[in-house]
């Protein structure tokens, strides 16, 4: 409402709307504030101008691409939920073993889901982008990013993934954002993507 609230003569701090950024995570950074092994972390390499943030999910140390960052833990948890329905899209470069061959038909089987070491993955979608010699480029889309899911799916197909890049998370795409750069998403855009009820609950300002 814009009213000023005083308690014992002190101005109460107004609730801050959650903020959200796109970040182009480089390969070789751990998605953690601290790493027991002393490896470089995402949060130690962010611009000093950023406030304290948490990540929306994680990317493996050898995975590059889009990582969403937010000042609000509740927003992060909401966006991580598979029930949100947002697709995570990856571009994968992998090497085919001497006895393996990948076709679109074999990739279409991922739509039914699969189990690896007792863990259920999918259903997921994968498209064969191109092949060059024993290398293959795939586009994989999933609604839930379990630990090392893309690499484990690739291994199940007889592939050895050697490059993994997340190109989008829900409606937010990596685009031409440079490696290591951050770009804040406007409040209006966040509100439009989350919908009115969720936005109001999380304190997003439209």
Language-model segments: which ranges?
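Basic, flexible Lys/Arg- and Gly-enriched helix-loop patches that mediate nucleic-acid binding at interfaces
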Residues: 1-206
């Amino acid at each position: 409402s814009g009213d000023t609230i005083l308690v014992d003569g002190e101005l109460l701090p107004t609730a801050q709307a959650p903020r959200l950024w796109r970040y182009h995570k480089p390969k070789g950074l751990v998605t953690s504030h601290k790493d027991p092994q002393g490896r470089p972390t995402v949060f130690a390499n962010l611009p000093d101008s950023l406030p304290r943030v948490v990540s929306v999910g994680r990317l493996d140390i050898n995975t590059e691409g889009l990582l969403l960052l937010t000042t609000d833990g509740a927003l992060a948890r909401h966006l991580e939920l598979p029930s949100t329905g947002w697709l995570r899209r990856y571009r994968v470069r992998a090497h085919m073993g001497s006895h393996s061959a990948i076709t679109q038909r074999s990739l279409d089987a991922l739509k039914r889901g699969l189990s690896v070491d007792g863990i259920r993955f999918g259903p997921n979608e994968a498209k064969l982008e191109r092949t060059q010699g024993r290398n293959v480029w795939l586009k994989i889309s999933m609604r839930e990013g379990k630990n090392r899911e893309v690499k484990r799916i690739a291994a199940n197909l007889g592939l050895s993934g050697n490059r993994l890049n997340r190109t989008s998370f829900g409606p937010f795409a990596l685009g031409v954002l440079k490696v290591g750069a951050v770009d804040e998403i406007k409040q209006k855009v966040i509100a439009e993507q989350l919908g009115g009820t969720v936005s109001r609950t999380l304190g997003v300002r439209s």
